[in-house]
Amino acid sequence: MLVQSRTLVTAILSCSLVFGTTVNGASVAIAQENVPMAALYEPDYESLETRLGSINNDAGLPNSVSQTVENFAELPEGTRFVLDSDTFAVAVSDGVVTSRLDSQTGVIRHTFGGAGTISYNPGEVTRSYIDRVTVRVVYPDSSIDIVTPHSVVEVSDSFYYSVQSIDSQRVRNGQSIKVPMTVIAGDGAIGGVPQGAKVVRDRYGSVEDAELMGATIVIDEKTGELTFTAPEDRTGQMWFAAELIYPDGTYSEVHYLFEVTDKSVQDDSVPFFGSSLSS
């Protein structure tokens, strides 16, 4: 049985409530006048728990999902649905997830990036939106029910987490270098690879291409630490990528750039390009 918040607001009274009783063995209807429609009906929203992803996400997460009034057909014709707020807004949005209410059907549509563009402050990303919409159900007689449907809407792991940019590296022929992976959560917490996630070679074969050029690349699946050993007889730029695969199946690409120099080069004090790469 769905448990949801419901508040009865008495407004204009214009209909009758009919009770059944028995008199001398016969069923008799007794009408009580001036009972609001809000006392006769109870809108019942379906419970919703979901995770939303980007439209470019290949993990099968939906970009948008609807939450409906399960007993909508039982409500009187002319019933309207509005947000329980002091404004005339038809949607609740924080720049990431938009929850839009249909005034005719009561359907709430939760959409990732539903405002057209995604905007947020780093370190202030919401992971889960719980019971975020409160609906004012307005009946034809102007009486009102206030309902807060139960919903838990989460954003994908690949949106909530981000990999800290990795500086380009300079390394001599035959030398090895270890590059750790740092992951930043949506709340600003800095740590390692999230529990349940793993780091693997990218699906496009860029690591294998680098190895064909003589490099040796080892990736720690749990920590994301990458060990790069430069080829003995080749110099120049070597680029490749790894993938951080999250528990929900979404992923982030992590890019690496190495400048391999000859052993005879003595001055390694100048960083290559002096820039960093975004993951």
UniProtKB/Swiss-Prot annotation:
Source domain of life: Bacteria
Keywords: Signal
Signal peptide region: 1-31
Name of this chain's protein: Uncharacterized protein Cgl1822/cg2042
Protein species of origin: Corynebacterium glutamicum (strain ATCC 13032 / DSM 20300 / JCM 1318 / BCRC 11384 / CCUG 27702 / LMG 3730 / NBRC 12168 / NCIMB 10025 / NRRL B-2784 / 534)
